[in-house]
């Protein structure tokens, strides 16, 4: 499989955004939008040896963040650009949403130790979590698997990871929910 990761560290506005979101929100979101579009265009180049493609984001991810970070005028302009770009974006065969409660997300943010995220407010993460929940509640574009990760740690616990992998191997159509218990 070919793995395509979000390149957050290439966004020169992101550290400033965490210090002053109102001032740097638009630049940060526009950079991410254009960066993801560039990645999507690179994915269009057919690789005959890679049949499976994995990404750690959806193209729409940036719009979800933008809805929290931009004022009305900025969002209007952002939407104009995003609507032009998203026509050329590859549609995924399956979306997996790793859902967690805000406390778990805050713990995970702390554990990954990114200096620029150390002062991120739990209220912001909670609002973002709500935006994602509402988005996936209405999502119908492709098969969707929602995995509740609040009570598991698939990074440190191989049994948790194996349980998820075994579930993903099943055919998934429509919207499915997986609520594993900690091993």
Q: What are these model-predicted stretches?
A:
Residues 1-35:
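Conserved substrate/cofactor phosphate-moiety recognition/catalytic segment
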Residues 62-133:
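A glycine- and Lys/Arg-enriched "phosphate-lid" helix/loop adjacent to the NTP-binding pocket
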Residues 4, 55, 94-96, 145-147:
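Hydrophobic/aromatic beta-strand patches that form the interior of the parallel beta-sheet core
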């Amino acid at each position: 499989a070919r793995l395509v990761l979000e390149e957050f560290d290439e966004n020169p506005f992101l550290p400033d955004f965490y210090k002053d979101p109102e001032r740097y929100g638009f630049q940060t979101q526009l950079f991410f939008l254009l960066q993801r579009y560039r990645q999507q265009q690179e994915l269009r180049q057919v690789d005959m040896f890679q049949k499976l493609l994995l990404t750690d984001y959806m193209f729409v991810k940036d719009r979800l963040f933008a809805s929290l970070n931009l004022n009305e005028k900025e969002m209007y302009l952002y939407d104009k650009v995003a609507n032009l770009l998203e026509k050329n974006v590859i549609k995924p065969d399956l979306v997996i949403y790793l859902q967690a409660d805000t406390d778990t997300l805050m713990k995970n943010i702390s554990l990954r130790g990114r200096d620029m995220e150390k002062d991120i407010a739990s209220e912001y993460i909670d609002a973002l979590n709500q935006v994602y929940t509402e988005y996936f509640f209405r999502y119908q574009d492709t098969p969707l698997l929602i995995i509740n990760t609040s009570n598991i740690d698939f990074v440190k616990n191989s049994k948790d990871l194996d349980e998820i992998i075994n579930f993903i191997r099943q055919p998934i159509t429509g919207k499915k929910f997986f609520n594993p218990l900690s091993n």
